[in-house]
């Protein structure tokens, strides 16, 4: 890569967002989530990468929160539980919408029964597409 190309490369996810936006003061909801996680002392999230939650990853990178990407959401939930039990810190599992959230239920239930401090953040389809059969649209609050 040439020096010229390197100098034009974004250094952070915030830089990338700023380039996409006409208003550099705009911040995504995912970045706000990451800032809130950092404020609460979260230093690691367990996840399976998904499109609905990509802005959270960008925010976590900017905030210095470690992202542990696993192969299944149930693994992410169990890992967050194990992390909480071993460290005494809040374990955080981040899943994409629909099946991503439902796949984590067993791990979240295990943590609940064991009184492990974990937080499950689930993605959601766009509100403009809510209840219109969009990809992975599922009401998750009741689950």
Name every feature range the model reports, one short phrase each.
Residues 2-141:
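N-terminal alpha/beta PP-like core and its mobile active-site loop of ThDP/TPP-dependent enzymes
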């Amino acid at each position: 890569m040439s020096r010229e190309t390197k100098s034009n490369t974004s250094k952070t996810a915030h830089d990338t967002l700023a380039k996409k936006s006409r208003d550099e003061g705009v911040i995504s909801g995912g970045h706000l989530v990451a800032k809130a996680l950092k404020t609460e002392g979260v230093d690691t999230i367990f996840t399976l990468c998904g499109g609905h939650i990509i802005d959270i990853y960008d925010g976590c990178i900017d905030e210095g929160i470690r992202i542990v990407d696993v192969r299944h959401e149930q693994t992410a939930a169990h890992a967050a539980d194990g992390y909480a039990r071993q460290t005494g810190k809040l374990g955080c599992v981040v899943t994409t919408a629909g099946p991503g959230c439902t796949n984590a239920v067993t791990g979240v239930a295990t943590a609940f029964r064991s009184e492990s401090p974990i937080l499950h953040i689930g993605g959601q389809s766009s509100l403009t597409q809510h209840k219109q059969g969009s990809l992975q649209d599922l009401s998750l609050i009741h689950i």
